[in-house]
Amino acid sequence: LAAGLAPDGGLYVPEHRPRLQHWSAHDSFAQTAAAVLAPYFHDDALVQVLPELCAQAFNFDAPLRPLATADDHVLELFHGPTAAFKDFGARFLAACLARLQQGRERRLTIVVATSGDTGAAGA
């Protein structure tokens, strides 16, 4: 979770994509996010607190908007506290790292960089 890049310098990509069933039957984006993320955390220490982490990270509205020409929807990614799409990923990553750090005496410093105006999402 904290490594960033894979050992070969690329991105981490799941070996398998689990089939997600009934993912849209939840009352909030945070609940849906926890259901979608759960298969990727199945053997991780955070799996038990995943719903709590999602509720903490996604404590804002994330509306789905229907597309005019198809039976599809678009998730609007500008409704977070900084109005940037990175509110979704950065806030979840920060919540996970903070939880992993709980109970440890050693201080953790997270250094991030941005090339645009979305850096506030990681703060």
Question: What residue ranges belong to the model's regions?
Answer:
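PLP-dependent amino-acid enzyme catalytic core
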Residues: 1-123
